[in-house]
Amino acid sequence: MSRKHFLTTVLFLLTTCLLQAQETERQYLSGTGLDNTVTWQFRVSEGRNSGRWSKIEVPSQWELQGFGEYTYGRWYKKPGIKNPSMEEGTYKRSFRIPRNWQGRNIRLWLDGVMTDTEVFVNGQSAGPVHQGGFYRFSYDVTDLLKYGSSNQIEVRVKKHSDNRTVNAAERKADWWLFGGIYRPVWLEAKPAVHIERLAVDARADGELKVEVHLQGVTGEESLSMEVSPVSAKDAEHRPVKVTADSVQLLTAHFDGISPWTPESPTLYRLTVSLLGKAGNVIHSMNTRIGF
């Protein structure tokens, strides 16, 4: 098959309506930022307004919502002070998810919680305790959810970690200590066979490598990628047949791209599609990239 014929076929398959039908669906359980929050039930163990159930806005720092204790991060330099701000907070809320999500893969994402975090869905543990407050983490909650009916999430947070190295890196610093769910929380629904994540290496000469992490593939699928606004005639690309391995590598070269610079920060949209045996789009994922 010629390059031009292949790219024409790919562009036909990647029509807008088809992409919308197969893209990841997201449902927020919190707000999306400090100016857009959602109310959860909350109880803190020590400090202000402790020992009773109340309400808190999520995402936020619980100190700024009137809970717990303010402590300056260099407390360890002062004699006689040992491990202040040892509060533990518990968050709860109910939520519903669509019935048509049944049969899909559902992951619960927490974008940032300070510091140790344990999550329960409908009374069952979602997975191991997460330690560290500066990066997102997730759990596969597919089998824990009730589809089309009410669910409950409970998040237990320790302001100080049980891990001494985490405390040394995050708690003993020149800042005010804080605790809580301070970044968004959401659910992601994907097909059972899907793209889990992408690792992108884009070079200034137009060379592009994409490591595609897959879940549930059988070896009958294939992968395709598209970069916009790069036109089809400027693209050099071939289809990649998927093996049963969960990690696949896509490579391509794009002529005529505008490299990213501080003066001209040009961005492109990369779309990677997982195709079925008949050429149908099973799932697609897109992200912004710069060369």
For the regions a language model picked out, list residue spans one by one.
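Accessory beta-strand-rich segments of carbohydrate-active enzymes
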Residues: 26, 43-47, 61, 82, ...
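Short, aromatic- and glycine-rich surface loops/edge beta-strands on solvent-exposed regions
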Residues: 152-155, 264-276
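Short glycine/proline/serine/threonine-rich loop/turn segments at secondary-structure transition edges
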Residues: 101-104, 145-150, 253-267
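Bacterial N-terminal signal peptides that target proteins for export
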Residues: 1-10
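Accessory carbohydrate-binding/adhesion or oligomerization-edge regions at the termini
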Residues: 21-74, 156, 160-165, 230, ...
